[in-house]
C-alpha cells in the first residue's frame, strides 16, 4: 500500500533548513507510529509504503504535522501519455463512481504535453458511462489524479490529520497535570505545537487520582507521535499538611505556587524550557489576573497557558475530541482545598507564607514516583 502524506501548510512556509528539519521529525514520528514500512520525501509531500494489512494506518490521523493523507494507486511511468492515465483511471475509479454523481480533480507538477484541465475532462468522459452524472460543484463522490513529473497517483479518499507541528520540533515543556478536564487539553495543544510534554502530577487523591491520570495519559500517548511520556507523581498530601499552617484564603494560590516551584526544578532536571498549565482566565478564583500574577511571580521559566481564552464549553468539546473527557469527568476536584479562596491575594502575604513554610522543592521532586508511558 502506498500513501501520500501532506504535511501541515505552515511547514511549507518555513525556511528550507527548518522545513527539512520539520519534515525529518515528522517522518521519524510516522515511523514510530506505523512500526514498519518505507518513507521518503518528495516535492513537499511524504510517501509511505507499507504492507496492505498494516492496522496502524488509521493512527496517522493523530500524528501532529499531518494535514491529510490518502491511500493511492500509481503509474510509475506513463511516458507523458494521457491515454495511459485515462485507462488507469477507469481501472481504479469505475466502481467508485458507479451509479453516483461525480467529479474529477487533477493537478500536476512538472512539464507535460497536456494540462490539468485536459486530464479532468478526458478522465471525466471515460468515467461518465459508469456514473449517474457529473457535478463539479456538489458531487456525491470526488476522484483525484495527482501527476508528479513521470508518476501519476490516483485516489478517492482524503483523510484529515490534526495539522500542527511534529512533536519534538519545539523542545520540552513541564505540564502541571491535575487530571481534570483542562490539563489534558492543554497538554494536547502543546503537543500540537511541537512540544514534548514532561508530566508533573501532584497526587491529592491517592490510588483513584493516580489511576485516572494514567488512563488520560494513555489516551494522550496516542497523539504523541511515538514519543514516550514521562510522568512525575508528587505526594501532594505532604504539601497540604504544610499548607494547613497558613490562612485558608491564601491556600489555593499557595498550592499552585508550590506546584510552579517544583515544576521549575523539574525544568532544570529534564532540560525543559517552559511550564504549561491548563489555567483559563477567570474560570475559578485562583485564575484571576491578580492571582495568576502572584502564582508565577519570580518563576524563571515562561508559563504557557494554551487555554487562557477558552470557556469551559470549548474546553470540554476539545476534551471529547481528544478522548480524555470520559476519564476527566470521573475525577473529583482535588485542588479545591479552601472554600474561602480570595480572587485577589496579596503578593507580600504569599511571599511571607512561602518563607515561613520553607518547603524543600528539590526534595519534593526527588521523592516523586517516575513512570514512563
Swiss-Prot record:
Lineage: superkingdom: Archaea
Enzyme Commission number(s) of this protein: 2.8.1.4
Domain THUMP positions: 54-158
Name of the top EC class for this enzyme: transferase
CDD domains (UniProt xref): PPase_ThiI (cd01712), THUMP_ThiI (cd11716)
Binding-site residues for ATP, renumbered to this chain: 176-177, 201-202, 256, 278, 287
Membrane-spanning parts: none
Reactions accelerated catalytically: [ThiI sulfur-carrier protein]-S-sulfanyl-L-cysteine + a uridine in tRNA + 2 reduced [2Fe-2S]-[ferredoxin] + ATP + H(+) = [ThiI sulfur-carrier protein]-L-cysteine + a 4-thiouridine in tRNA + 2 oxidized [2Fe-2S]-[ferredoxin] + AMP + diphosphate; [ThiS sulfur-carrier protein]-C-terminal Gly-Gly-AMP + S-sulfanyl-L-cysteinyl-[cysteine desulfurase] + AH2 = [ThiS sulfur-carrier protein]-C-terminal-Gly-aminoethanethioate + L-cysteinyl-[cysteine desulfurase] + A + AMP + 2 H(+)
SMART domains: THUMP
GO BP of this protein: thiamine biosynthetic process; thiamine diphosphate biosynthetic process; thiazole biosynthetic process; tRNA 4-thiouridine biosynthesis
Main subcellular location: cytoplasm
GO cellular component: cytosol
Keywords annotated in UniProt: ATP-binding, Cytoplasm, Nucleotide-binding, RNA-binding, Thiamine biosynthesis, Transferase, tRNA-binding
Subcellular location: Cytoplasm
Purpose of the protein: Catalyzes the ATP-dependent transfer of a sulfur to tRNA to produce 4-thiouridine in position 8 of tRNAs, which functions as a near-UV photosensor. Also catalyzes the transfer of sulfur to the sulfur carrier protein ThiS, forming ThiS-thiocarboxylate. This is a step in the synthesis of thiazole, in the thiamine biosynthesis pathway. The sulfur is donated as persulfide by IscS.
Protein name: Probable tRNA sulfurtransferase
